[in-house]
Amino acid sequence: MNIHEYQAKEILSKYNVPIQPGIAILKYEDIDYAIDSLATDTFVIKAQIHAGGRKIGGGIKISNDKNEAKNLAKNMWGMNLVTPQTGPKGQKVQRIYIESAAKIKLELYLGAVIDRSNHCITFMASSAGGINIEEVAHTNPDKIIKVKINILTGIQPFHSRKIIFQLGLTGDLAKQMAKIMSAVYSMLINTDATQVEINPLIITLDDKLIALDAKINFDDSALFRQPLIQGMRDEDEEDHLELRATKADLSYVRMNGNIGCMVNGAGLAMATMDIIKLYGAEPANFLDVGGSADKKRVAEALKIISSDQNVKGILINIFGGIMRCDIIAEGVLAAAKEINLSIPLVVRLAGTNFELGKEILSNSKLQIVAANDLDDAARKIVEAVS
């Protein structure tokens, strides 16, 4: 789960990470009051969307005049902000953060991530802050400092010293960085965050470290024990089909292809997407109905897939173990009849009660194409949408 910048800063400040004074505006009519309330000579007006690169699209403005700041915020509200991360469709601005401008001497980068490949938490830092860190990692990887931390021992002074030394920080700045790293580590562990980025982490003219921008991602599977974090969810920022799938307890990721996929098991789902690509087409989604799906969940899965206007055909690939193929067939029929499905549908069933499942589908009056195996299923659906 992603959250907005102002929410990330709110969390970080609770762990004593320094931030600039700011006010989040959640209603258009609160703009004037918020700007009047912020004691500063220079206002920074920031669009709040779940995407980076906001400045490029006009989502960050600076003003030394209070009235101008109000007009900038009002013009920003409701705009369709297009950035390199939103894609051409952009994202509608429905929240704004007004912040006091900082006097910057230097911009750094600091991040921490759950590093599954190395089974640890990895801190990353760079003197090239304020810009796209992925681009820095690609063009100048030597600029990225990495420190791996064993989750059993936690962050230790020598971890901080490595980053502090390589960044060239001394004296009070070194102490500040050590405190911020310790705070970020504690926050990541305590909130079930998977990624924390402070970019830039600035050094001010009076040698103070301040988190000028922040991004935090959280583990969706752990939200049940993080009610405060869950309360920060902004459903307007999420894909409506992915949100609908989450509420139905379905693992669904929307993609850019035109062949919808319904599969049980993540590994089988990825194999299904791979073979669709092998036949020259593109999957429209990843959807795992899980091993214990019932008729209702299967029906909802088909409705979600068919709600994507890019989908021109659907491939259902089920290997029945715990899940029975006849349950899948009944759910598919119920949903197909309810939504009056009119696009090609290819179904491959194998495993528990697959004969009964095939019989249920074949006895229906719907135009459903049966497949003998995965290769046959992929070939048939690609041919059907070509």
Swiss-Prot record:
InterPro entries: ATP-grasp_succ-CoA_synth-type, ATP_grasp_subdomain_1, Succ-CoA_synthase_bsu_CS, SUCC_ACL_C, Succ_CoA_ligase-like_bsu, Succinyl-CoA_synth-like. Substrate binds at residues 264, 321-323. One of its GO terms (cellular component) is cytosol. Its cofactor is Mg(2+). GO terms for molecular function: ATP binding; magnesium ion binding; succinate-CoA ligase (ADP-forming) activity; succinate-CoA ligase (GDP-forming) activity. ATP binds at residues 46, 99, 102, 107. One of its GO terms (biological process) is succinyl-CoA metabolic process. SUPFAM superfamilies: Glutathione synthetase ATP-binding domain-like (SSF56059), Succinyl-CoA synthetase domains (SSF52210). Binds 1 Mg(2+) ion per subunit. Pfam families: ATP-grasp_2 (PF08442), Ligase_CoA (PF00549). Mg(2+) binds at residues 199, 213. It is an enzyme of class 6 (ligase). Heterotetramer of two alpha and two beta subunits. This is Succinate--CoA ligase [ADP-forming] subunit beta. It comes from Orientia tsutsugamushi (strain Boryong) (Rickettsia tsutsugamushi). The lineage of its organism: Bacteria, Pseudomonadati, Pseudomonadota, Alphaproteobacteria, Rickettsiales. The gene is sucC.
